């Protein structure tokens, strides 16, 4: 969008209104907006930030509705969740991540320099005029709604974001987690690392939101485990996930075997051998519920341990499969 003779006064008035709302006095910058401009340069001390005019007008159309909690900022048809990508809090080039998650009227994507989060940080004075930008240091998962009627509740937005984070964690070798918005001037120093692309893809990868796993306690446990920085503790939390699903896996297996036994009843007599097999099946199920067997049961049933054997820690090395199995 370019500034024209017809819209320049409206654009200047809107910028002035929004900046006043968040506590900025930038009349000089506003007065310098000229025809054919597509961006405005905002000077925050030693930090200059270029703001796309079209995006600014779209996302701050209802600036009075802006609200925020510990992790996200909402304004009109947009919600931005602050996220971290493991090892790359600073200098991240989010263009390496191509996903756009869509369903009717709703789109979720990664956004560098998230405008709404930046405005929240300015309003709350959570930036440093000399060293820390309120916008450029952040990355967000942005939910955009085509119309107000498609807006989710705050609770459902969190569930949707957790589903998207699960998908991103599964796809990349980076850990994507929600990150609490700053409650002070965040002058911590992070290591700057180069982000390597996991593919040579350059087009946006459109993914249906309907294809994502449904939100569940197990999905929440997975996200919580990925947020733990200590790898030993993270491993223990992943083990708890195996424990969580193991009763369901054990029940599934015993149902399958029980059905096989009952099918056999149709073609054979109910003799002592048959009844003993049912008793043994029950005993095997009881044994499968013991702590020492649970992890083996889940991994044997749900994972290809031939491919994973080099990644399995030594304490569970005894449960590895061989090709013959």
What are these regions (language model features)?
Residues 2-230:
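Charged, non-catalytic interaction/linker regions at domain boundaries
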Residues 200-325:
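Amphipathic, oligomerization/interface secondary-structure segments
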């Amino acid at each position: 969008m370019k500034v024209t003779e017809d819209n320049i006064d409206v654009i200047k008035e809107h910028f002035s209104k929004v900046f006043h709302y968040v506590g900025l006095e930038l009349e000089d910058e506003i007065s310098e907006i000229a025809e054919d401009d597509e961006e405005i340069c905002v000077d925050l001390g030693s930090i200059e930030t270029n703001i796309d005019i079209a995006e600014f007008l779209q996302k701050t159309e209802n600036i009075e509705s802006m609200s925020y909690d510990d992790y996200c900022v909402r304004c009109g048809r947009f919600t931005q969740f602050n996220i971290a990508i493991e090892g790359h809090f600073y200098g991240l080039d989010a263009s390496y991540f191509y996903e756009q998650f869509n369903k009717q009227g709703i789109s979720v994507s990664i956004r560098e320099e998230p405008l709404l989060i930046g405005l929240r940080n300015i309003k709350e004075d959570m930036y440093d005029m000399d060293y820390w930008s309120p916008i450029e240091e952040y990355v967000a998962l942005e939910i955009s709604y085509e119309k107000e009627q498609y807006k989710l509740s705050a609770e459902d937005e969190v569930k949707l974001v957790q589903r998207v984070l699960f998908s991103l964690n599964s796809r990349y070798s980076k850990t994507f987690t929600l990150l609490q918005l700053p409650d002070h001037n965040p002058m911590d120093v992070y290591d700057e690392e180069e982000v390597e692309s996991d593919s040579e893809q350059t087009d946006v990868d459109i993914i249906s939101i309907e294809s994502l796993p449904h939100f569940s306690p197990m999905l929440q446990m997975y996200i919580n485990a990925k947020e733990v920085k200590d790898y030993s503790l993270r491993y223990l939390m992943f083990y708890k996930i195996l424990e969580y699903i193991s009763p369901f896996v054990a029940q599934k297996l015993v149902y399958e075997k029980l059905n096989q036994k009952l099918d056999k009843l149709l073609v054979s007599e109910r003799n002592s051998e048959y009844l003993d097999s049912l008793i043994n099946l029950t005993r095997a199920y009881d044994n499968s519920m013991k702590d020492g067997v649970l992890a083996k049961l889940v991994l044997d049933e749900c994972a290809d341990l031939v491919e994973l054997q080099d990644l399995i820690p030594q304490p569970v090395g005894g449960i590895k499969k061989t090709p013959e199995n």
